[in-house]
């Protein structure tokens, strides 16, 4: 286990995939050629299937396009299954893939419950399972994603810093995503731990939009009508929260209501920052997450361990981004293909 974890650190820090396979070079006299031979045996020709909650969102598309590019270079067969926000369909796709028996499944859970049993069955069938950003209640071989409690705390502290001083109404509103997802639960827990320390902050609305831009827009419009002196809106995902931004602009409150959001640095986040529609975006870089998912998948394939042996977590760093520090590389363009 120590060797696996040490290798994981090397993989993620340097992009190096040589420390697994047959073991340390110095200890066993392995040559670079022998390591490459073992790597080819363990990795090349293997199959990875990626099942996001939808492939029609910029975030999940960035993950898929980046992983597909890496897989092509590594000689890994990579495919994508799109349930298009249909939870029942996602469960059916996962069950179908278990029967097809790929080497690795990369799964994006809509909530903590619905895919848990299927993920466990996948491991029992000899398939490695990597969960991304939204974990299930079942711990699979690996989790890659932002640490949601930390994310929620960081965002809430930003809200407090912006709205806790004199001259502010101290009123804020929250826009959750899917309330039963581990990601949403963690953000809420982290945020509330901060807000409880600042009783001057008044939460006038706490609603959920289920990741839907229009729902977020409509609910925000109602809140803004009731509270035109709102100081800030804190949302759980930039794709959803673009609807809040439009509601703020339509209400004539641009520059008055500060929108705090988060996401993988996908469009239109950076454009919204430079235009003043978003105040601060707590970015967990989507391309880095894709790199992490592929590195972990390679590690598992080379480990020789039975699926279900390891429970590894790899947390993506959070990059607070505003109009002052946003750059051309802060966000990732996404292809429509």
Where are these regions (language model features)?
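Hinge/cleft segment of the Venus flytrap/periplasmic-binding protein
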Residues: 28-46, 175, 179, 183, ...
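Extracytoplasmic "Venus flytrap"
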Residues: 30-66, 70, 74, 78-92, ...
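Short, solvent-exposed amphipathic alpha-helices that sit
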Residues: 59-73, 151-158, 182-201, 215, ...
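Short beta-strand elements at the ligand-binding edges of bilobed clamshell
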Residues: 80, 136-161, 174-176, 206, ...
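Hydrophobic alpha-helical
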Residues: 104-124, 191, 209-271
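Flexible loop/hinge segments that line or gate small-molecule binding clefts
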Residues: 112-150, 171, 265-274, 278-279, ...
């Amino acid at each position: 286990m120590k060797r696996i974890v040490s290798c994981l650190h090397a993989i993620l820090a340097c992009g190096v995939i040589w420390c697994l396979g047959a073991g340390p070079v110095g200890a066993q006299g392995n040559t670079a050629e022998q390591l490459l031979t073992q790597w080819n045996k363990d990795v090349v020709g293997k199959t990875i299937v990626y099942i996001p909650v939808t492939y029609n969102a910029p975030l999940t598309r960035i993950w898929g396009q980046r992983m597909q590019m890496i897989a092509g270079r590594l000689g890994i067969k990579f495919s994508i299954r799109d349930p298009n926000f249909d939870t029942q369909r996602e469960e059916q796709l996962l069950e179908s893939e278990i029967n097809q028996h790929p080497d690795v499944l990369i799964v994006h859970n809509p909530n903590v419950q619905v895919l848990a049993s299927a993920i466990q069955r996948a491991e029992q069938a000899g398939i490695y399972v990597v969960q991304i950003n939204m974990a299930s209640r079942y711990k699979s071989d690996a989790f890659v994603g932002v640490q949601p409690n930390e994310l929620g705390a960081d965002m809430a502290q930003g809200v407090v810093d912006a709205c806790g001083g004199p001259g502010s109404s101290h009123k804020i509103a929250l826009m959750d995503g899917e309330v039963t997802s581990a990601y949403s639960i963690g953000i809420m827990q982290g945020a509330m731990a901060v807000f409880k320390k600042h009783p001057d902050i008044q939460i006038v609305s706490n609603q959920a939009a289920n990741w839907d831009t229009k729902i977020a827009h409509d609910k925000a419009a109602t809140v803004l009508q009731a509270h035109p002196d709102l100081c800030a809106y804190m949302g759980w995902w930039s794709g959803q929260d673009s609807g809040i931004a439009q509601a703020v602009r339509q209400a004539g409150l641009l520059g008055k209501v500060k929108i705090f959001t988060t996401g993988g640095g996908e469009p239109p986040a950076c454009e919204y920052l430079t235009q003043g529609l978003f105040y601060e975006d707590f970015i967990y870089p989507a391309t880095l997450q894709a790199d992490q998912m592929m590195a972990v998948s390679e590690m598992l394939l080379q480990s020789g361990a039975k699926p279900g042996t390891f429970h590894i977590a790899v947390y993506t760093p959070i990059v607070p981004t505003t109009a002052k520090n946003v750059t051309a590389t802060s966000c990732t363009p996404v292809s429509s293909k």
